[in-house]
Each structure stands twice: as C-alpha cells, then as structure tokens.
Swiss-Prot record:
<dbReference type="Pfam" id="PF07998">
    <property type="entry name" value="Peptidase_M54"/>
</dbReference>
<feature type="binding site">
    <location>
        <position position="270"/>
    </location>
    <ligand>
        <name>Zn(2+) 2</name>
    </ligand>
</feature>
<keyword id="KW-0645">Protease</keyword>
<dbReference type="InterPro" id="IPR012962">
    <property type="entry name" value="Pept_M54_archaemetzincn"/>
</dbReference>
<keyword id="KW-0862">Zinc</keyword>
<feature type="binding site">
    <location>
        <position position="265"/>
    </location>
    <ligand>
        <name>Zn(2+) 2</name>
    </ligand>
</feature>
<dbReference type="GO" id="GO:0046872">
    <property type="term" value="F:metal ion binding"/>
</dbReference>
<feature type="binding site">
    <location>
        <position position="264"/>
    </location>
    <ligand>
        <name>Zn(2+) 1</name>
    </ligand>
</feature>
<feature type="binding site">
    <location>
        <position position="292"/>
    </location>
    <ligand>
        <name>Zn(2+) 2</name>
    </ligand>
</feature>
<keyword id="KW-0378">Hydrolase</keyword>
<feature type="binding site">
    <location>
        <position position="254"/>
    </location>
    <ligand>
        <name>Zn(2+) 1</name>
    </ligand>
</feature>
<comment type="function">
    <text>Probable zinc metalloprotease.</text>
</comment>
<dbReference type="InterPro" id="IPR052009">
    <property type="entry name" value="Archaemetzincin"/>
</dbReference>
<keyword id="KW-0479">Metal-binding</keyword>
<dbReference type="GO" id="GO:0006508">
    <property type="term" value="P:proteolysis"/>
</dbReference>
<protein>
    <recommendedName>
        <fullName>Archaemetzincin-2</fullName>
        <ecNumber>3.4.-.-</ecNumber>
    </recommendedName>
</protein>
<dbReference type="GO" id="GO:0008237">
    <property type="term" value="F:metallopeptidase activity"/>
</dbReference>
C-alpha cells in the first residue's frame, strides 16, 4: 500500500492559493467554514486523511493526470457555472431501475433527494422515465460477461436533444451496463462537460454482478434489426440494497462534480478521486476534501453548515425526502418504501463531527 501525503504548505496553497484576490475571498468565508477547511493541512486531522493506493491498477497510478488546485479551478476558462436562469439539474431514468414500478420510482426519488442535499441550493428535477427504445441507441451483449450493454455516446446525444432550457445539466441513470466504443469492455459513466450531459450506469453495483451466479447473462442476442429493442423488456435488475444505493449516490455526485469542472482529486481522500475498479470506488469516501468542497461551494454558493444539515436529514428521513418530486403518474399505488441507509450511518457520524467544528 502506498500513501500519498502532501506537505502542509502544498495543501494550504492548493486550498487557499497565493493569489491575493483568492486569499481575500477565502478570508471572507464564515469563520466556521475556514476552521473546517483548514483541517486540510492539519497533520493530526481526523476528518481528512491522505489518499491510499492499494495496487498498481488504482487510478492515480494507471492514469497520470496533472492535479487541479482551487486557483486552477477558479481560472478555468471552460468551466461552466450555474446561472439564475440555468440552475436546475435534471435526472433522466432510462429503463426501469427496480424490479417493480414502486421500487424503481422510490429509488429514483432517493437519488434525487441525495443530489438536492449534495448540491445544496440547486433545483433537482425528475424527467419522465423513458424506455431504452426511446433513445435509439446501439446495444450489444458483452462477450466477456454476457450482459446487455447500451452505447454511452448515443445516450449522450439523446440527452443533449432533451436538455431543458433552464438546465445546468441533464444526467441519465440506468441499470443497464454501458460501453463507450466497440473496443472497450465497459464504462461506469460518461459525460460531456461542454454540453452539460452525462450518463451513468449502476448495473455493476449489485452484489452478484461479478459472481458465477449472476442472473443478467444473455446467452445470445437475437434481434431482427437495429431497431428491435424487445430484448430490454425483461432485462435483469439487481436488488436495491443499502450498498447499491451508496455506490449509486457516489457515482452520481462524482460525475456531476465533473460537470461543474472539478477534476480528479489528488490531494486528500475525496469523492472526486478517480477509480479504476469497484474495490477502489468503494474505498472512496462520500465526502469532498476541503479543496474540492471550496470548488463546489464557489460554483454553487451554498452554506456548508446548511448543506451538511441537509445531508443528515436525507440519511435520517426514512422515505424519499422529496415530496412532490415524482412525475404525476407515479403517485398512484402504495406509499413510500423504507430507504435503505444503513451503509450511510458511518458517514452521518463524520458529518456530525464536521458540524461540531463549523458551529464551535
């Protein structure tokens, strides 16, 4: 195992900058917010720790990238920021996300509520779910895993056409595996920062995906034409467990973070670290390090205290926490299902520690 440990001065500069304008901006932050963010360069901090690499296949080792400090983020000419008339994040479900209509709709509401808390201050809106056939995307059966896959690039084109006028971004979510091109095995997600669109799959987050008993294998792809989507009528969907919900929330917020202009984090253990495989993704925390937190706060303009309180409320709320957020047709049928948040309890304790620092 390798530990990436930066010096106090390096972390301080990455967070605050040496640019007098950005230093002044930092000094105008709430005293509690400065106190929390200063934990970034406190060696004894129990809130923010160094990045640990466990194998040569981990992201930082296999995908060398230049780090992005706050000043580089702030000065990025290609970075998009929400404006008063484009301040909504739209979520588009593609295909069913649960084994019943109620489970699918509740799961979407849980994800929506989480995004509302994570990107506190932005509007998060649901679009009516669409079947795979509506996207007109290419698809295949993966030769190695024998599971169905849809073409990520085709989905991005579909989402770009559907993007509402008031959207900062539109993100597609699906339980069907993705591939970006014929030569690739799979991809967890793909986004276009310039177009403000992204597509993310949670298919590989089920507990059985990598097991011999995985039920999503398709023996042979039978289609009469490229427009025959009947194979998706009963595709396999894993059970929505607490771990799958946690993994989904991580991926969704990580990828939307990229649309805000946050690059992969190389400073401290952080949600914005890259991940090359599921084990590495599971190691990533749900939280942003102070450097990435300052970036997101700069882009969105939230109070850190209120954001953390909203996240605690989402964990504590047994139902969706997003009243009125579901499409009209979904209000028929039985009520809310219990939200499986067991996997989030440790993170809740961490947030409460942060709130104690913020509210001293």
């Amino acid at each position: 195992m390798q530990i990436i440990r930066h010096s106090e001065q390096t972390l301080k500069t990455a967070l605050i900058s040496k640019n007098p304008v950005l230093v002044s901006q930092y000094e105008k932050l709430d005293a509690g917010e400065q106190r929390l963010m200063n934990e970034a360069f406190q060696p004894a901090s129990d809130l923010f720790g160094p990045i640990t690499l466990h194998s040569p296949s981990d992201w930082i080792t296999s995908h060398p990238e230049a780090p992005q400090d706050f000043e580089q983020f702030f000065s990025d000419p290609y970075r998009k920021t929400p404006s008063p008339d484009k301040r909504s994040v739209y979520i588009q479900a593609i295909g069913s996300l649960g084994n019943t209509r109620i489970i699918s709709e509740e799961y979407i509401k849980w994800l929506t509520g989480y995004c509302k808390a994570y990107f506190y201050g932005l509007r998060v809106k649901l679009l009516e779910p669409v079947p795979v056939s509506a996207t007109r995307c290419s698809f295949r059966v993966n030769e190695n895993t024998q599971n169905l896959q849809i073409h990520a690039g085709d989905i991005l084109k579909f989402l770009k056409k559907k993007k509402p006028e008031d959207a900062f971004c539109i993100v597609g979510i699906t339980m069907i595996d993705l591939y970006p091109r014929d030569s690739w095995n799979f991809v967890f997600g793909q986004a276009s920062l310039t177009d403000g669109v992204g597509i993310f799959s949670f298919a590989r987050y089920g507990s059985d995906f990598y097991s011999m008993r995985y039920e999503g294998k398709v023996k042979k792809l039978k289609k009469t034409s490229s427009s025959d989507y009947s194979i998706f009528n009963n595709y396999y969907i894993p059970e929505i467990t607490s771990v799958l919900l946690l993994r989904s929330c991580k991926t969704l917020t990580h990828e939307i973070g990229h649309i805000f202009g946050l690059r992969h984090c190389q400073w401290l253990a952080c949600l914005m670290q890259g991940s090359n495989h599921l084990e590495e993704s599971d190691r990533r925390p749900l939280n942003l390090c102070p450097i990435c937190l300052r970036k997101l706060q700069c882009a969105v303009g939230f109070s850190i205290v209120e954001r953390y309180k909203a996240l605690v409320r989402w964990i504590d709320d047994e139902s969706s926490g997003t009243p009125g957020a579901t499409p009209e047709h979904s209000r028929e049928g039985n009520g809310n299902l219990p939200k499986p948040v067991e996997a989030f309890k440790e993170w809740k304790e961490w947030i409460i520690k942060c709130l104690a620092v913020l509210q001293k």
